[in-house]
């Protein structure tokens, strides 16, 4: 059970805030923007969805490379695997092709804020279908959202999901890259996004 009092104290800890600023500055200093932007532009020009996904994955990985050794994210911490995670239709197809997992195509796609809020309410706290024994079973094919999920905190205290509670989690700012991803897919009108659990529903619990 999450210790909400401890979490709220951590949210307001000045030392944590200062740490987040320092780490963010160092990640931005390390970030290979030229390479990342070149890959994003190649993805935008790519003709096949598969090629777009591969190029965007390589671009997104630049965040993880820049953050190496600076952040609490590591194998065994699966808090973010219990968060709502929006992925593009082409990412879902790539995951299905690489893993053999059966994919369900949502009846409709939507990215407005009300939809995203509903998705968060529905899936925050629900384990990703591909979380196995506390680790991602499709790590090489994990979504872009997972690749750019970089927590700039001292530890993972603020990563814990608390139902009904909004927790301020210090993250690297990826808005510029998010826009590059949007344009690679064809712009806002082609944003065929849904939560990963919409494409790959969690397996039923046979113990119930």
Annotate each language-model stretch with its function.
Residues 1-79, 83-135, 139-208:
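Short loop/turn segments that flank or connect secondary-structure elements
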């Amino acid at each position: 059970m999450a210790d909400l009092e401890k979490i709220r104290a951590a949210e307001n800890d000045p030392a944590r805030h200062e740490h987040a600023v320092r780490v963010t500055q160092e990640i931005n200093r390390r970030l290979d923007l030229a390479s990342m932007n070149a890959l994003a532009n190649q993805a935008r020009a790519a003709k096949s969805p598969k090629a777009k996904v591969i190029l965007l994955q390589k671009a997104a990985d630049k965040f993880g490379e820049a953050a190496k050794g600076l952040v609490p994210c590591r194998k065994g911490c699966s808090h973010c695997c219990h968060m709502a995670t929006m992925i593009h239709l082409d990412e879902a197809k790539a995951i299905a092709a690489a893993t053999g997992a059966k994919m369900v195509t949502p009846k409709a796609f939507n990215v407005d804020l009300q939809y995203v809020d509903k998705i968060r309410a529905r899936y925050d706290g629900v384990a990703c279908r591909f979380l196995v024994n506390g680790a991602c079973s499709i790590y090489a094919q994990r979504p872009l959202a997972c690749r750019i999920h970089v927590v700039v905190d001292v530890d993972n205290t603020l990563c814990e999901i608390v139902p009904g509670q909004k927790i301020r989690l210090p993250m690297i700012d990826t808005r510029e890259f998010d826009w590059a991803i949007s344009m690679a897919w064809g712009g806002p009108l082609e944003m065929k996004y849904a939560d990963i659990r919409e494409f790959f529903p969690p397996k039923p619990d046979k113990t119930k």
